[in-house]
Amino acid sequence: MDASMMAGLDGLPEEDKAKMASMIDQLQLRDSLRMYNSLVERCFVDCVDSFTRKSLQKQEETCVMRCAEKFLKHTMRVGMRFAELNQNAPTQD
């Protein structure tokens, strides 16, 4: 968990901070695994169509690489956009 998230927990007792940090870490891990599984499924379905060999054909391998790069670039762009929106959002104090 990063420092900006911990700053929001300043008013809590240490035990509650630890519980919240653990919960946030679990949620981040779950989301990372979900994103990975989504990437694998999408690229496999879109790119792999021959099951005559145990390894990918060159065109399938190229397709998977492009698919993964596109997915990750899109995910990074969405994350950057959310960060921009969060920076510009008014805070409630």
UniProtKB/Swiss-Prot annotation:
Motif annotated as Twin CX3C motif, chain positions: 43-67
Protein name: Mitochondrial import inner membrane translocase subunit TIM9
Keyword field contains 4Fe-4S: no
Similarity field: Belongs to the small Tim family.
Subcellular location: Mitochondrion intermembrane space
Species for this entry: Arabidopsis thaliana (Mouse-ear cress)
InterPro entries in the record: Mito_inner_translocase_sub, Tim10-like, Tim10-like_dom_sf
Lineage: Eukaryota, Viridiplantae, Streptophyta, Embryophyta, Tracheophyta
Keyword Chaperone carried by entry: yes
Listed GO MF terms: metal ion binding
Gene Ontology CC entries for this record: cytosol; mitochondrial intermembrane space; mitochondrion
Annotated gene: TIM9
